[in-house]
Each structure stands twice: as structure tokens, then as C-alpha cells.
């Protein structure tokens, strides 16, 4: 939203990531850390696809992400057949849902780390200034030398990664993933 755009597909990115990571750990017996890396990559790819539609095909962010919301939800239904993926191994669940110290769960630490990274980017780095500049006036930002396309790509990729992390945390909390996850 800072860049003057919007991503309506975050709930579906959240769902697809949970489904893929659950399938990797349950069906294929993948190592949980490797499954998390796959989940982050899924979020980045889905975010990059949104960035492609908006930057290269010049679609309005609302329309592009409304379309990818439907596309990603459809993929989630096709992959699962509408049936939740259950029985996620404890080894995965403990990564995001385990207690670290004094009752603090690991997902709290993950949330704080993501918040700190976002805060540093937005308030301490030039790229954060670029994000605000694009949201304020994209044409003026472009004339000021900001690489608008690259910056918007990175914003959508970061958004996808954040949605993926949320999906993986919810998977750890619930122990299952389904195509309807992330719906309002």
C-alpha cells in the first residue's frame, strides 16, 4: 500500500504456501527446514508474478491481484481436491509453535524479526525512501532516478514472502492446511 498499490492475493498465497509445505512434510517426508525454504520461495514466486502483471503488463494492482487471488485459490483447490492436508509432523510444528523461553513461542520471535526487518527497510534504508516516493508520486520518483519497476517488484516479493511466512505459522499452529485458509 505504501507504493500506491495493493495485494489482494495475500490470503491465497498464505493458503497455497501452507498446502505446499504441508504436502512436502506429510506426503513426501521432506525435512521441515527444507520445506520452509520451499515455502518462502513459493511466496517470493507468487509475489514476483504479481509484480510482473503490474510492472510489465501494466495492469492496475487491484485488478491484477484480484485475478491472482482467484488463480491462486483455484490452484489450492486443484492441489488438495478440496480436502485438507493433515497430520503435519511435530518436527515441523515445533519450529514455529515451539516454546523458546519463559512461555514465548517461536512464532512471536519470527514476527518480531519480520517487523524489525520491515522497520529497518522503511525507516533506515534508501529503498524505504524509494517505496514512499513511489507511493507519493510514481512519476516524480521515476524522474528522481528511482528504479520504480525494480522497487515495486521487491515490494510485491516481500509481500508474498510475508504471506508465506504467515501461512507456515498457521500450518504449525493448526497442524493442517486447506484451500479455504486465508479467506475473509
Where are these regions (language model features)?
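Alpha-helical transmembrane segments within multi-pass membrane transporters and channels
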Residues: 29-69
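Hydrophobic alpha-helical transmembrane segments
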Residues: 12-16, 33-41, 63, 108-113, ...
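Membrane-interface helix caps of multi-pass small-molecule transporters
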Residues: 23, 28, 45-57, 75-79, ...
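Hydrophobic alpha-helical segments embedded in the membrane of multi-pass proteins
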Residues: 12, 16, 45-48, 112-116, ...
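Transmembrane alpha-helices
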Residues: 63, 147-171
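Transmembrane helix-bundle core of multi-pass membrane transporters
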Residues: 57, 61-127, 151-154, 173-182
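Single transmembrane alpha-helix segments in multi-pass membrane proteins
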Residues: 1-28, 52-59
Amino acid at each position: 500500500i505504501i507504493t500506491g498499490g495493493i495485494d489482494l492475493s495475500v490470503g491465497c498465497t498464505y493458503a497455497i504456501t501452507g498446502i505446499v509445505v504441508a504436502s512436502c512434510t506429510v506426503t513426501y517426508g521432506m525435512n521441515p527446514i527444507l520445506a520452509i525454504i520451499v515455502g518462502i520461495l513459493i511466496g517470493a514466486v507468487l509475489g514476483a508474478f504479481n509484480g510482473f502483471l503490474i510492472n510489465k503488463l501494466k495492469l492496475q494492482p487491484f485488478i491484477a491481484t484480484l485475478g491472482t487471488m482467484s488463480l491462486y485459490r483455484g490452484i489450492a483447490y486443484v492441489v488438495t481436491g478440496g480436502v485438507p492436508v493433515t497430520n503435519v509432523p511435530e518436527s515441523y510444528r515445533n519450529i514455529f509453535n515451539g516454546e523458546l523461553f519463559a512461555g514465548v513461542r517461536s512464532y512471536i520471535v519470527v514476527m518480531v524479526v519480520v517487523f524489525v526487518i520491515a522497520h529497518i527497510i522503511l525507516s533506515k534504508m534508501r529503498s524505504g525512501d524509494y517505496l514512499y516516493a513511489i507511493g507519493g508520486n510514481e512519476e516524480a520518483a521515476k524522474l528522481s532516478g528511482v528504479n520504480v519497476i525494480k522497487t515495486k517488484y521487491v515490494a510485491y516479493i516481500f509481500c508474498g514472502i510475508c504471506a508465506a511466512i504467515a501461512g507456515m505459522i498457521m500450518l504449525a499452529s493448526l497442524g493442517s492446511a486447506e484451500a479455504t485458509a486465508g479467506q475473509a
